Amino acid sequence: AVKSAAFANGMPDTSSWKPGVDYVRADTGDDFPDAFDAVVMIEKAVVREDGSVTFDDDVTVEPGSGVRPAGSTLRAGEPLMSAGSIIRPTDLAALAMGGATMVPVRVKPRVAFIPTGSELVPAGIKPRRGQNVDTNSLMCKHLLIEYGAEPVVFPLVHDDPVELERAFEAALATADVVVVNGGSALGEEDFNVKLIERRGQVVHHYIAAVPGRPLMLAVADGKPVVDLPGPTMAAYFGSEWCLQAITARILGIPLRRRPVVQARADAAKTSIPKMANIARVHVTRDDEGYAAHFLDFKAGELAACMTSNAQRVSPLGEAGWAEGDLLDVELLRGEEFVDQG
């Protein structure tokens, strides 16, 4: 750090300069006496053993150059963040700069997830004939975490009305939102619908979306209740449009938007115009741009659907598309994960 006045008439004679008198050493972020009002990068200077200094010929010094005065990082009264913002690591740094070590935040909604079905076994248990692995608890738990909720996953509940009611009441007592998974249709053992109809007020049952049409929305004890269909893709779609929206509403944040690209359809496909249709897609990239291979969860491609890198939700009124049509698809892993060729 130097005194800019010494450079008023160009490069001064520095052969007799002394540290602490004509200049001081200062690392990035250091404070130094106010008399030294400019900084020259050390890469542009040579400090001799006797303390004198020489500067590169191209050094120019103006008052305040290289110096950040006190208060320049943040001005008194300047807003740091807006309400409803999600606090990122960089936001924490800005808050600390302003001395805000404690800020009010919205509490993450506790979402109870009750998996139901006598045919289900926990993940990690080899299923016998007639049994299915409970994959939805794992999937929906981490979807809810992505959405900003605090999931509370209950143990598996058999298709037993008494056992189901016990779990449902426990969930209502401890959570802000209750999700019952399975039993949302009108089958012989679909007890969930009857329980929710008796215990709460049904807002809507059967929606214009496939897969997942039997989804039910209700309110019980003033809390949102969702009966999420059991099939994996149906549970996923219901989580995406319904559970995510409920969580965002409670948190007061907008719905997230994934990156969207236009991709060529590799085959013609029909959809139900009266329904929103979700399709999982594998997107690749070639010399002509993006290509979309649509997967069919009903044709033995369920695992591939779950690990695909994109998806598309067909809007209401769309009857399908032809091979080669350019379609908007959502990237689920980011553009950097799209395969080449």
Where are these regions (language model features)?
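Short beta-strand segments
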Residues: 25-27, 56, 82, 113-116, ...
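Phosphate-binding glycine-rich loops and their immediate beta-loop-alpha structural context
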Residues: 66-180
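Phosphate-interaction motifs
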Residues: 1-101
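Flexible glycine/proline-rich
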Residues: 74, 197-341
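Short Gly/Thr/Asp-enriched flexible loops that form oxyanion-binding sites at enzyme active sites
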Residues: 187-199
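Short glycine-rich anion-binding loops that position phosphate/pyrophosphate groups of nucleotides
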Residues: 29-30, 118-119, 183-186, 231-232
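Solvent-exposed alpha-helices and their adjacent loops that cap or buttress functional pockets
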Residues: 10, 15-18, 32-34, 46-48, ...
